[in-house]
UniProtKB/Swiss-Prot annotation:
Pfam families: CHCH
Originating organism: Eremothecium gossypii (strain ATCC 10895 / CBS 109.51 / FGSC 9923 / NRRL Y-1056)
Location, primary (coarse class): mitochondrion
The protein's name in its UniProt record: Small ribosomal subunit protein mS37
Gene Ontology BP annotations: mitochondrial translation
Family, as annotated: Belongs to the mitochondrion-specific ribosomal protein mS37 family.
Function summary: Involved in mitochondrial genome encoded proteins translation.
Keywords: Disulfide bond, Mitochondrion, Ribonucleoprotein, Ribosomal protein
Length: 95
């Protein structure tokens, strides 16, 4: 069949691996509260009673996280799932 273009296959990979997986980190709650408090103060004036709830929330948040969180940073699971599902996505022929 001279009219068909040849199809090229990629060489098989020993494993599928992402070198630097990016984990979406959630925003620090205390930083969000502090930003809201500063914005409230700039709009309403320093120590305005309108901003009192934000100030107490920020104090509570910072007292809970005095020494930082003891949680380890989460590892990405992309490489685990890529290895687990490699047979399905590598294009191997079916039974």
């Amino acid at each position: 069949m001279p009219g068909r273009t040849p199809t090229y296959k990629l060489p098989p990979l020993p494993r599928l691996k992402v070198k630097k997986p990016v984990i979406k980190q959630e925003a620090n709650r205390c930083l969000v509260l502090m930003s809201n408090l500063l914005q409230c103060w700039s709009s309403n004036g320093h120590m305005n009673p309108v901003c009192e709830k934000l100030a107490t929330d920020l104090k509570a948040c910072t007292s809970q996280n005095v020494m930082g969180s003891n949680q380890k940073p989460r590892k990405s699971t992309i490489n685990y799932h890529a290895a687990r599902l490699y047979d399905r996505i590598s294009g191997k022929p079916h039974d």
